[in-house]
Every structure is written in structure tokens, then in C-alpha cells.
């Protein structure tokens, strides 16, 4: 395992609407299918530190690709780079990584998005594959971030329940089918987490899309029943509804 530390200027406030996070920590969302993934990012004051763990020694092209991605996506300018000595790292199974990621993401959503429930508009947390986190402010009843592939997303439902709309379920199906880990909806009374526990099956993908087509016409009780049935029968999706 190789570790790289990137020191970058902090212009994160331009990415989180009118709010500035004094510190944002993203830990241990590891993907065993790519060379380098961010295991920790800390942003304080005018500096940011991002640690990368790699399965093999990165080439100069790998490093250039990572730096270009960070600058393009986050608008952060890299002004220093330090590469440490390789260290031992035992790769665990993909399923174990997904389990760890679900537990971490659930706590991250509660920690970072809960303060925004007091605001009467939706907010979204997006985690990119390189470990960068973005919080975006949406409109009164919706928020949308176009563009890139995400490892995980979450958004708030202020003043309402954490039940998904048809668009929420379509977005969840697309994210999980594209290799993403999990998506969540946070409301004042509950948290809904939809996540992969293995490679998404075609049956589960079709079930999510079928549910998305009809969910807006369902009663509250019917939707809960459908979600519970999917959670109990699926081999590749887990659904958790947590009371707060």
C-alpha cells in the first residue's frame, strides 16, 4: 500500500453553497477495483489534506490523473505533493468493504446533513469515487447534482418523511447499477438507507425501476410494505429504515 498526501488550497465553500464546513472528514470508503482511493480528507482553514491508499506503486500518469481529477472536480489547486513509503495492506473481500462502507456512510449522513434539516429546503451530500465530498443546496422540494459517477449520495426531506419518490428510486437504481455503494434520505423522524451488499442483480434493478414507476400513487402503508418485501427477498440490496 502506498500513501500520498496532497496539500491543497481550500476553496470548498464555493462547492457547498452559502455554507462553509470548517472540517470535512471522509474515511475508509475503499474500492478494491481502482488503484488509488481517498481514505481520509481533512479541510481546515486554508489548507486541505487528502490521504490516498494504493494497491500498487502509482505511475506518474496515475498521479497526474488523480491531481487533474481533484483540480477539475473540486476547483482546488494542488500546491504540494508528498508520497510516503509503501506499507502493508491486506485486501478484504468486496462484500466486507461494502458492509464497512454502509456503516460509515450512515454515520456520515447523520453527522453532516442533520444540521440542514432545520432549513426549509433540500440539501444533498455527494461522495465522488476519489473521496471528495460535496454538499449542495437545492430548492424547497428538490435538489439535483448532474454530471459525474458517485460512490454514494444522500439528501434531506425537511419537514416530511424519509420515503423515496419515483425519481429517488430511479436515481438509486442507476447509482447501484453503476457500482455505487449506497444512497440515503434523511428526514427529521427517520433515515432510509438503500445500499448494495453485493454486485447488483438484474432482478433487483428491475424491481427498483418497477417500484419507481408506481411509488407516487401508493399509500404510505403500501410503500412501506413494498420496501420491506424488497429488503427481505433481495440477495444484493439491503434497505434500512431507522427512527431518529
Model-derived segments and their meaning:
Residues 90-97, 122-123, 151-155:
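A generic short-segment signal for beta-strand/edge and adjacent turn/coil regions
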Amino acid at each position: 500500500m502506498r500513501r500520498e498526501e496532497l496539500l491543497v488550497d481550500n476553496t470548498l465553500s464555493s462547492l457547498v453553497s452559502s455554507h462553509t464546513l470548517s472540517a470535512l472528514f471522509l474515511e475508509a470508503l475503499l474500492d478494491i477495483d481502482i488503484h488509488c482511493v481517498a481514505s481520509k480528507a481533512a479541510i481546515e482553514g486554508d489548507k486541505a489534506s487528502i490521504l490516498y491508499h494504493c494497491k500498487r506503486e502509482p505511475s506518474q500518469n496515475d498521479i497526474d490523473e488523480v491531481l487533474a481529477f481533484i483540480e477539475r472536480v473540486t476547483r482546488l489547486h494542488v500546491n504540494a505533493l508528498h508520497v510516503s513509503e509503501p506499507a502493508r495492506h491486506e485486501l478484504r473481500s468486496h462484500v466486507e468493504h461494502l458492509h464497512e462502507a454502509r456503516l460509515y456512510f450512515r454515520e456520515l449522513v447523520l453527522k453532516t446533513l442533520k444540521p440542514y434539516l432545520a432549513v426549509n429546503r433540500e440539501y444533498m451530500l455527494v461522495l465522488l469515487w476519489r473521496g471528495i465530498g460535496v454538499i449542495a443546496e437545492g430548492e424547497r422540494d428538490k435538489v439535483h447534482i448532474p454530471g459525474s459517477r458517485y460512490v454514494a449520495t444522500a439528501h434531506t426531506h425537511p419537514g416530511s418523511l424519509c420515503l423515496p419518490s419515483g425519481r429517488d428510486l430511479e436515481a438509486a437504481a442507476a447509482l447501484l447499477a453503476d457500482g455505487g455503494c449506497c444512497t440515503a434520505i434523511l428526514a427529521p423522524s427517520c433515515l432510509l438507507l438503500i445500499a448494495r451488499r453485493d454486485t447488483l442483480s438484474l432482478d433487483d434493478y428491475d424491481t427498483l425501476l418497477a417500484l419507481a414507476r408506481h411509488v407516487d400513487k401508493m399509500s404510505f402503508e403500501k410503500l412501506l410494505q413494498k420496501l420491506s418485501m424488497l429488503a427481505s427477498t433481495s440477495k444484493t440490496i439491503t434497505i434500512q429504515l431507522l427512527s431518529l
